[in-house]
Amino acid sequence: MDVIHPEIAKAKTLPSKYYTEESLYKSLLEKFSTTWNFVGHASMLEQSTTIPALIGNNPVMVTKDELGKFHCISNVCTHRGMVLTEGPTNQRTIKCPYHGRTFNLCGKLKHMPEFEQAENFPSASDDLPSKKIKNWHGLLFANLPVSYTHLTLPTTA
């Protein structure tokens, strides 16, 4: 693609297909879903305990637990697939608005109404899936694939 040019006067705009073609959009979302994505700044979690974000089309949330550790977990309830939060919150737990499942800030299921007597409950599959997260000078990056572990960060002067 001949769009980027070191001299701004010779640069071109992106072809319109980048804004209109559904197949290209889906292809780009897929590519972005397999790499590190910016999901927020650490300062966003000074007044909140959770902030929602998207990696591709995948709803995630960035949390900061009681010890100040950052986590990136799924923002979709493991029970019925409900999105858990639409905006920043400042709660010690994450509660599903559908059936009331409650998770801690690491994504571990803490409570499900009327399931106190259920056998073999909860199991690990009831917890919110965790994603990798890295903090680089306050910039928070996360990725979906568990197998993708290396984040190359620029060096600072």
Stretches found by the model and what they are:
Residues 45-144:
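Rieske [2Fe-2S] iron-sulfur-binding domain
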Residues 14-55:
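Non-catalytic accessory segments flanking enzyme active sites
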Residues 38, 83, 157:
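Conserved beta-strand positions that form and line the central face of beta-propeller blades
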Residues 3-15:
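Short, contiguous pre-domain boundary segments
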Residues 146-148:
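Glycine-enriched catalytic-core subsegment of oxygenase/oxidase enzymes
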Residues 1-3, 24:
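Rieske [2Fe-2S] iron-sulfur domain-containing proteins
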Residues 150-157:
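Single conserved hydrophobic/aromatic residue that forms the stacking wall/gate
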